[in-house]
Amino acid sequence: MDQDNERNVSRLWRAFRTVKEMVRDRGYFITQEEVDLSLEDFKAKYCDSMGRPQRKMMSFQSNPTEETLKKSPNMGSVWVEFCDEPSVGIKTMKNFVIHIGEKNFQTGIFIYQNGITPSALKLLPSVAPATIETFNETALVVNITHHELVPKHIKLSDEEKKELLKRYRLKESQLPRIQRMDPVALYLGLKRGEVVKIIRKSETSGRYASYRICL
């Protein structure tokens, strides 16, 4: 395997691990073994005899954990797909959209290499009420939530959000905001109106929590 390909495979392996962590952090069932897959095992499982990655084989489905379903009983399954083609056009995206709809997935996560055409992006809303999220492979090589300067973010369930507003006698408009395109909001798949709890470390009080609403 040449050095460039070796580097690309290593980056793809790291992106794959981030995706598994991201799906698990959203409350879906992912085993620790899946997260800890070694580079050698990744090559054996997802590369051909020439050492080239076969992205189609990396697609996977995950269901919410029992604990997640207690808090969010309507949370459906997620389908994650890594795209083989460097650039994504209408045909490829249409196939992905059809798959999400036909299999009744609530969320589709589409991971691309270089770019998606504007026409292909226009297809995304057609799966409503399901949602499709797109991520560039490069953006997933490092898990941003593991950075020491990024505090812990936890998405609240609808019930937890109601309790929060009631406890502090707040209206939604009084909560600080987090933009939907914020990297951590994208990582957690936050939708408009959802609230995230942010836990920061404090030198004086140990830990403290703040809340932000996604807009």
Swiss-Prot record:
GO cellular component: RNA polymerase I complex; RNA polymerase II, core complex; RNA polymerase III complex
Location(s), subcellular: Nucleus
Main location: nucleus
Keyword Cell membrane assigned: no
A single GO molecular function term of this UniProt record: RNA-directed RNA polymerase activity
Keyword entries, A-Z: DNA-directed RNA polymerase, Nucleus, Transcription
Gene Ontology terms describing biological process: termination of RNA polymerase I transcription; termination of RNA polymerase III transcription; transcription by RNA polymerase II; transcription elongation by RNA polymerase I; transcription elongation by RNA polymerase II; transcription initiation at RNA polymerase I promoter; transcription initiation at RNA polymerase II promoter; transcription initiation at RNA polymerase III promoter
Name of a matching Pfam family: RNA_pol_Rpb5_N
Segments forming a coiled coil: none
Protein task: DNA-dependent RNA polymerase catalyzes the transcription of DNA into RNA using the four ribonucleoside triphosphates as substrates. Common component of RNA polymerases I, II and III which synthesize ribosomal RNA precursors, mRNA precursors and many functional non-coding RNAs, and small RNAs, such as 5S rRNA and tRNAs, respectively. Pol II is the central component of the basal RNA polymerase II transcription machinery. Pols are composed of mobile elements that move relative to each other.
Homology family: Belongs to the archaeal Rpo5/eukaryotic RPB5 RNA polymerase subunit family.
Subunit structure: Component of the RNA polymerase I (Pol I), RNA polymerase II (Pol II) and RNA polymerase III (Pol III) complexes consisting of at least 14, 12 and 17 subunits, respectively.
Name of the protein in question: DNA-directed RNA polymerases I, II, and III subunit RPABC1
Source organism (scientific name): Eremothecium gossypii (strain ATCC 10895 / CBS 109.51 / FGSC 9923 / NRRL Y-1056)
Gene that this polypeptide is encoded by: RPB5
